[in-house]
Amino acid sequence: MSQSPIELKGSSFTLSVIHLHDSRPEVIRQALQEKVDQAPAFLKNAPVVINVATLPNGANWKDLQQAVTSAGLRIVGISGCQDERQKRAIARAGLPLLSEGKGQKMAPEPVVSPPENVPTKTRIINTPVRSGQQIYARNCDLIVISSVSAGAELIADGNIHIYGMMRGRALAGASGDAQCQIFCTHLGAELVSIAGQYWLSDQIPSDYFGQAARLHLLDNALTIQPLN
């Protein structure tokens, strides 16, 4: 029996979500361009989701689409849209609408207690992480016992530990766990992110550059402190 020419498989990806609070295309374009210029290696040609939950009706979707793409970003979908007229306008502009799975109320599943004494998996990297490399620790913590070059990317659903110079990007809590943290012995990252809350390099306090630091969320905002 010959193999099918295609195969559909479920998967998951880490995408940046841009929340629009203004419907003026030029204002959006300038704001996005500033972000892209701050971290071109991370954001240039990056796939993004546009969240329109707080955007007023009546936006020109063709112009907004052009504003986002002209800043060097690629729209893969629109989320947060609840208004039917707005949905039709977005569809006419050729933009895909994404469902965030909150529309239907499901009966709660019974809580199952986890088995005791089950060790938490951890992915350990013992070699340097080079520019262009991406390492993803699915459903576990990530430990890197070496340096991370600029242009490299670390992603973990759990915590991230870097025992070396960190010049790349670190995204902890990628599946949305706001309790995750980032620990680094020599912080010089292009970007740090926990559960979608992120700082670009120029937002990291300069006092911590090259220093040992711990990052976590406090009241849904990134915070940093010395790692002793």
Swiss-Prot record:
Establish whether keyword Cell cycle is in the entry.
yes
Q: Which UniProt keywords apply?
A: Cell cycle, Cell division, Septation
UniProt-listed Gene3D superfamilies: 2.160.20.70, 3.30.70.260
Q: What Pfam families does the database record attribute to this sequence?
A: MinC_C (PF03775), MinC_N (PF05209)
Q: Could you state one GO biological process linked to this protein?
A: cell morphogenesis
Tell me yes or no: is Nucleus among this UniProt entry's keywords. no
The record's subunit annotation is: Interacts with MinD and FtsZ.
Its biological function?
Cell division inhibitor that blocks the formation of polar Z ring septums. Rapidly oscillates between the poles of the cell to destabilize FtsZ filaments that have formed before they mature into polar Z rings. Prevents FtsZ polymerization.
Q: Which family does it belong to?
A: Belongs to the MinC family.
What is the name attached to this protein's record?
Probable septum site-determining protein MinC
Source organism lineage?
A: Bacteria, Pseudomonadati, Pseudomonadota, Gammaproteobacteria, Enterobacterales
